[in-house]
Regions:
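N-terminal metal-binding scaffold of metallo-dependent hydrolase/deaminase domains
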Residues: 1-43, 54-55
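C-terminal cap of metal-dependent C-N hydrolases
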Residues: 15, 380-438
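Active-site gating loops and adjacent loop-to-helix segments of metal-dependent hydrolytic enzymes
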Residues: 71-102, 131, 159-175, 237-264, ...
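Alpha-helical scaffold segments that flank or form the walls of functional sites
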Residues: 73-124, 129-149, 180-194, 442-451
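Metal-coordinating catalytic core of metallo-dependent amide/deamination hydrolases
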Residues: 131-270, 276
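Histidine/acidic-residue-rich catalytic or RNA/ligand-binding cores of hydrolases
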Residues: 162, 237-249, 277-282, 299-308, ...
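His/Asp/Glu-enriched, well-ordered alpha-helical/loop segment
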Residues: 257-264, 306-390, 406-408
């Protein structure tokens, strides 16, 4: 039995059903779960942390990433491109992915996430070059090394350039190949138990890079195995025009006809929904992963988050891939989301606390998890803490629930705890040799890009 006790926490932001913020509270964790929250708990533990100056929050939950893109960030040739041209250029790099690239880029990306308070990462991996090996296995290995909670996906593409899609032939597969490997990945890696450290979703890339048959079969398979469905949707006007030209209908109607609505489905981006479509999402419980930094960089537009929240559309927060974000900090995403919607919606904009809830409870809902996203007894012991004595936080004690949005935290957090295990201490990863990972990843990245 492993135990952790954090004593006398300055402010504990629970994000629970009562939105409680507790002062001078203790939190006791046992075998990965929260067993007690209170004051002056008379309990011994394997490790005791003094929380007397700490702001404590539920671990952040990232609902959309492309970890393999860590090795293609800050590339000058794509800095001023919009989505379709950006993708066509980068596919020429991504077609060289292998297990080493996936393991090291995943260690880097998830390590960066964890250093900034993220305890659960969903990754949308859809590029499977022929003879590239077990890419999801490499990603699972990286997550285990770090100690982060991972939600993988068996993504896919079956339409190459010759079929009217965007990717080259070398990274697409047949529907039969994709379905067979999706079953393999679910049966090998998916754990549906409470507190699971690894789950798997079925996640075709996007309606402009996969066939209707693949989308239809993916929905059937996911429901047969009781796993979730994810894809990109309504990210750009180019996508909307592409679907209108090819199918004669808008993207969401197309997906609805193929079985892609429901509380087991969430879409990345969701920028270009009209009023009727927003109401449809709300009625069906279909979710949206909000990726503000990526949307700004690729000039994709601004998602209608205030309207979504008002209607009851499930919304979570996400960093998106490191090639369109150039980083993996959900803390940064949180503050950008707060500021972006202040600019566009003023009094209707989400508060700093609303965005925190989006990145915790909201994100957990998208992933179908009621065991993470809040600090309450019986939930997973996933949390992070920030020392309130930091220079940049002077004078910020009045509203601990909103401060991550209104003021922001730009450096690593002081502690991250996943499943009751300390994974970040004083801003540094403790489960891996951070300097060694960075050195190996940089060397591999240089070799990878040199072969393009």
């Amino acid at each position: 039995m492993s135990t952790l006790l954090i004593k006398n926490i300055h402010q504990l932001v629970t994000c629970d059903d009562g939105d409680r913020v507790l002062q001078n509270a203790d939190i006791y964790c046992e075998d990965g779960f929260i067993k007690a929250i209170g004051t002056a708990l008379d309990i011994s533990a394997d490790e005791v942390i003094d929380g007397s100056h700490m702001l404590c929050y539920p671990g952040l939950v990232n609902t959309h990433h492309h970890l393999y893109q860590v090795f293609s960030r800050n590339l000058p040739q794509v800095q001023n491109m919009e989505l379709f041209d950006w993708l066509k250029t980068l596919y020429e790099i991504w077609k060289n992915l292998d297990e080493d690239v996936i393991r090291l880029s995943s260690l880097t990306g998830m390590g960066e996430l964890m250093k900034h308070g993220c305890t659960t990462c969903f990754d949308h991996h859809y590029v499977f070059p022929s003879h590239s090996g077990d890419l999801l296995g490499a990603q699972r290995s990286a997550a285990r090394e770090l100690g982060i909670r991972l939600y993988m996906s068996r993504g896919s593409m079956d339409l190459s350039v010759k079929d009217g899609g965007l990717p080259p032939d070398s990274v697409v597969q047949t529907v039969d190949e994709i379905m067979a490997d999706s079953v393999r990945c679910i049966e090998k890696y998916h754990d549906d138990s409470y507190g699971a450290m690894c789950r798997v979703a079925v996640a075709p890339c996007s309606p402009f890079s996969v066939s209707a048959e693949l989308l239809r079969q993916s929905a059937i398979l996911a429901r047969q195995y009781h796993v979730r469905l994810h894809t990109h949707l309504c990210e750009t006007k180019d996508e909307e025009n592409f679907m209108l030209q090819r199918e004669g209908i808008r993207p969401l109607e197309y997906m609805a006809r193929l079985g892609w609505l429901g509380d087991d489905v969430w879409f990345a981006h969701g920028i270009h929904f009209n009023d009727e479509e927003l109401r449809l999402l709300a009625r069906t419980g279909t979710g949206v992963a909000h990726c503000p930094i990526s949307n700004m960089k690729l000039a994709s537009g601004v998602a209608r988050i205030p309207e979504m929240l008002a209607l009851g559309v499930p919304v979570g927060l996400a960093v998106d891939g490191s090639a369109s974000n150039d980083g993996s900090s959900l803390l940064e995403e949180l503050r950008v989301a707060f500021l972006l919607h202040r600019l566009h919606a003023s009094r209707q904009a989400p508060t700093g606390y609303d965005i925190l809830k989006m990145a915790t409870r909201g994100s957990a809902r998208l992933l179908g998890r009621d065991d993470i996203g809040q600090l309450s007894v019986g939930k997973c012991a996933d949390l992070f803490m920030i020392d309130s004595r930091r220079l940049e936080l002077v004078g910020c004690d009045q509203d601990a629930g909103s401060v991550l949005g209104t003021v922001g935290v730009r450096g690593p957090v002081d502690y991250t705890v996943v499943q009751g295990r300390i994974t970040v201490r004083q801003g540094h990863l403790v489960t891996v040799d951070e300097e060694l990972v960075a050195r190996e990843a940089n060397n591999k990245c240089r070799d990878y890009l040199a072969n393009v």
